[in-house]
Amino acid sequence: MDAFIATFTSPGPELFQLGPFALRWYGLLIAIAVLIGLNLSSSLARKRGLEQGLISDLLPILVLTSVVGARIYYVAFEWRNYSGNNFWSSINIFGLAIPIPSAVEIWGGGIAIHGALLAGTLAVLIFCRWRRQAFWDVLDVLVPSIALGQAIGRWGNFFNNEAFGVPIKGDLAWKLFIPFVNRPLNYANNEFFHPTFLYESIWNLLVFTVLIVLFQRSSKGLLKLPAGALSCIYLITYSLGRVWIEALRTDPLCLGALPPSCEGGLRIAQLMSLAMMAVGGFGLWWLYGRKRKLPDPGRPRSFA
């Protein structure tokens, strides 16, 4: 009996087009992830006793800064593709070509989750100082939604035919077809690749499950989970998966080298993941090894 083969083939990045405007799958998936995250984190915030409406006030700021941060991060490491003769592009509005910097064409793909995490964390910090909230408590109710949002958003890579892995060698029970136009030059003759979007989506669902189970057990008093512990666990568990999945990617952001191999250089996402694991590990050691609270950069409310 032949092994079951699941072949993933993208229908294309656009769901439909209305005049000059197109609804892209990636944008729709992000919108769905944001709505689910709003409801989930709001529910977790109530269980943590946080201020009512806090998450709905934070969310627009968090989404905007995360998207901008993700794009800036990506463009910074891929600047060769957005500079010189590639600096300018155009957008067609009712038949009129409007010149714009190519770096702002986010609808064409090109964002990096680590940039979103850095910018988003900074936004949460500033927001907490402004609203005098405990930074780690707020972050703890956000990270399950972040993990779930990543699981959903990774399917945008599938529709865009991007962020895929190396060609499949031998027989696998799954494979991803990539059109010729989207293949790296050195893999132009390969049709099927590792669906790294699927690997990371599944991994993020597992991370989400772990975080939710831990949160619920803590809420019921079955587990001691100090403020910040859940955030540290997210940093470690997400990064563990990203390190090995990134090794399969054909389009990594590289430092001192060019994709797909980054030969002679370093894969930025792996470096960032290792740094996140170190931060998360240190945080857990501080909480459970030294039995001390994490320093709070926010301004907790005074109940005096």
From Swiss-Prot:
Pathway(s) of this molecule: Protein modification; lipoprotein biosynthesis (diacylglyceryl transfer)
Annotated Gene Ontology cellular components are: plasma membrane
Cell compartment(s), UniProt: Cell inner membrane
**Top-level taxon:** Bacteria
- Give the top-level enzyme category: transferase
- Pfam families associated with the record: LGT (PF01790)
Record: residues binding a 1,2-diacyl-sn-glycero-3-phospho-(1'-sn-glycerol): R154
Topology of this chain in the membrane: Multi-pass membrane protein
Which biological process terms from the Gene Ontology are attached to this UniProt entry? lipoprotein biosynthetic process
- Record-level Gene Ontology MF annotations: phosphatidylglycerol-prolipoprotein diacylglyceryl transferase activity
In its keyword annotation, does this UniProt entry include Transferase? yes
Q: What is its EC number?
A: 2.5.1.145
What residues form the membrane-spanning segments? Answer: 18-38, 58-78, 106-126, 133-153, 195-215, 221-241, 268-288
Q: Which UniProt keywords apply?
A: Cell inner membrane, Cell membrane, Membrane, Transferase, Transmembrane, Transmembrane helix
What PROSITE patterns does UniProt report for this protein, alphabetically?
LGT (PS01311)
What's this protein's function?
Catalyzes the transfer of the diacylglyceryl group from phosphatidylglycerol to the sulfhydryl group of the N-terminal cysteine of a prolipoprotein, the first step in the formation of mature lipoproteins.
The text of the family note is: Belongs to the Lgt family.
Q: What is this protein called?
A: Phosphatidylglycerol--prolipoprotein diacylglyceryl transferase
Name the species this protein comes from.
Prochlorococcus marinus (strain MIT 9313)
Gene name linked to the record: lgt
